[in-house]
């Protein structure tokens, strides 16, 4: 959908370095995310509870009492998708094929890949998607 709006070639190499994820309990939220995505969380204290997603992206979980839920989308490999989906099923999280259908228990195949949506304990909508196969 969004890809159709982008030019074929992007003239710059831009990566997202970090973003702040609001949570009622930053440590619990960081642990949830790290456990579900198969990442490590090292609680060294400090203002943020950081989870390093890859070599360029860190999610900085931060305590907040009042926040709107956000949508975070992650492009993952097929193997990563399978492993995370297995952990979603093991933990009993509901999931769905679209942001408007978060509990239908189905995956989508938009753009030739696989996708799934689910909510974290803070109400943020998380999306996993794979490349076309």
Task: Annotate each language-model stretch with its function.
Residues 74-121, 125, 132-133:
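Vicinal oxygen chelate
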Residues 52, 62, 119, 129-130:
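Residue-level detector of conserved, well-ordered beta-strand and adjacent loop positions
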Residues 44, 63, 102, 130-133:
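Acetyl-CoA-dependent GNAT
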């Amino acid at each position: 959908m969004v890809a159709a709006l982008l030019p074929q070639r992007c003239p710059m190499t831009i990566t997202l370095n970090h973003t702040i994820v609001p949570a009622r309990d930053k440590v619990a939220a960081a642990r949830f995310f790290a456990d579900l995505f198969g990442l490590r969380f090292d609680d060294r204290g400090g203002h943020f509870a950081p989870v390093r997603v890859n070599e360029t992206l860190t999610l900085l979980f931060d305590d907040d009492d009042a926040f709107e839920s956000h949508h975070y989308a992650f492009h993952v490999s097929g193997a990563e998708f399978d492993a995370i989906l297995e952990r979603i099923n093991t933990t009993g999280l509901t999931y769905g094929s679209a942001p408007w259908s978060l509990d239908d228990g189905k995956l989508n195949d938009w753009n030739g890949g696989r996708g799934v949506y689910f909510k974290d304990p803070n109400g943020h909508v998380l999306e996993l998607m794979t490349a076309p196969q």
